[in-house]
Amino acid sequence: MGLLVDGVWTDQWYDTSSTGGRFERSRAVFRNWLTADGSPGPTGRGGFAAEAGRYHLYVSLACPWAHRTLIVRALKGLNDLIPISVVHWYMGKDGWTFADGEGVIPDPNEGVEMLHQLYTRAEATYSGRVTVPVLWDKQTRTIVSNESSEIIRMFNSAFDGLGAREGNYYPAAMRSAIDAVNDVVYPTINNGVYRCGFATTQAAYEEALTPLFDSLDQLEQRLTAQRYLLGSELTEADVRLFTTLLRFDPVYVGHFKCNLRRIADYPALFAYTRDLYQHPGVAATVNLNHIKRHYYESHHTINPTGVVPVGPEIDYGAPHGREALSTMT
C-alpha cells in the first residue's frame, strides 16, 4: 500500500496517528464524466463521448469498489465495448501491479507494469493514493475517472445509444430513494468494514463496529419483506451493497474483526446475497481466490504471516427462494 507524492512513488501505509486510530478514506481525484455526447457531467471537464473501443477499465478482482464497475458493465452488456485489464491480487511495495498470475490481464494501452505509472501518465505530478477502478481514455491518454460510484452511473446510461443492454439501475423516479439507501450503506457498511479493519485503537474499532451491525440488522428486516433494497426492482444500491456482503464472511469477519455476526447468520441477507450472485452475469465477475489472497497476503500490518484461511465453505449457488418476493412488493 503506497501513494504518489508529486509523481514519486512512496511505499506508505495509512497514517492513523493523527486521527485517533481511525481510518479516513481519501477522496477520488479524477472526477470527469463519460457521457453519450461528450458534454460535461456533474464534475470535471467534458470531451469524453461514448465510443466503442475508446475506453479501457482497470480493475482488481479483489476490490469491492472495482467490483461494482464490473457488475454494471456486465449487466449493461458492455464487455465488448469496454475492455478491461486486471491487476495482480497482491499489493506490495509497488502497489497494484500486472505481475504474472492467475486472472491477471496486462495493460495493452500504455504497457505499464505498475498501476501508479498509469496515474503519472495522466498527471506527471499527481499526489495521492493509486486506486482501482480506473476508467482510461485511450484517445487522450488520460484518466476519465477513478470514482467507482460515478463510473457505474456512466455505464448505466452513456452507451445506451451504442448497443448497451436495456436496463436502468438509477432511474429518475427512484433516485432520491436510491441515494438515501446509499447514504447509509456507504459509511456504515461499504466503508464501515474498512474502518473496523484498519482501526488502530480499540475505541476507533468499536466506533465503527456498532453502526456496521446496526445497519446490517436494519437491512435484514428490510429484505425480509422485499426482494431488493428498493422493492422488486434491482438498482445500483443493490450492486453497491452486494460487493461488501460477498466479501463479508470470507474476509471481513476474520481479517477485519467484523465478527459479531456473519452474513450467514442473517437469513434474509444471506439469501439476498445468493440471489444477486445468481443474477445473470454477476457470478462471472466474482473471483474469491483474488479476494481472499489480496486481503490476507497484502495487509501485513493486520496479518503479518500472510497465511490465508482455507474456509469458509459457502455455496453462493444454493437456492435462495426470493423470487416470490418480487410479486409481494
Regions found by a protein language model. Name each.
Residues M1-T329:
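C-terminal alpha-helical interaction module
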